[in-house]
Regions:
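Conserved phosphate- and dinucleotide-binding cores of soluble alpha/beta proteins
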Residues: 1-140
Length: 140
């Protein structure tokens, strides 16, 4: 029953919960889109926020967003801004760890500037220069 399985109060009672969730894209501040591509719904929200919150409240828990750094067509999934119309499933305030094939970014408690640097550091190397340039607009 999803009312029990996805219950944050139940999840947090278990120590060392590791919640691994996927993302369609993530912006350089840590906002996660996991249900849409722009304004086109791709999937349901599911229990992503339940498990992110439950793991973060679990003693020794680790909430993780894991994604490939690029789409199959080589487009970066780490972006300066989410696509117009994209839904924010997990807010930047709830994101702790983001993992790509290029490393791990621990965003918990970090400033926007620190988050930008950390997320660009785990982006595909071919996109890092462009992300550095585009991310200046985030801070403008």
């Amino acid at each position: 029953d999803s009312e029990y399985v996805n219950n944050v109060g139940i999840i947090q009672q278990n120590p060392k919960v590791v919640a691994i969730n996927n993302a369609i894209e993530i912006d350089v501040t840590g906002q996660v889109c996991a249900d849409s591509i722009g304004n086109k719904i791709y999937s349901g929200v599911g229990g992503q926020m339940d498990f992110i919150r439950g793991a973060s409240l679990s003693e020794g828990g680790k909430p993780i967003i894991a994604l490939n750094s690029t789409t199959k067509n080589g487009i970066s999934k780490i972006v300066p801004f989410l696509k117009k119309g994209a839904g924010v499933v997990t807010t930047r305030a709830h994101v702790h760890y983001v993992v790509t094939e290029y490393g791990i970014a621990n965003l918990y408690g970090k400033t926007i500037e620190e988050r930008i640097k950390l997320l660009i550091g785990i982006a595909h190397p071919a996109h890092r220069d462009q992300l550095n340039q585009s991310s200046k607009l985030v801070l403008a």
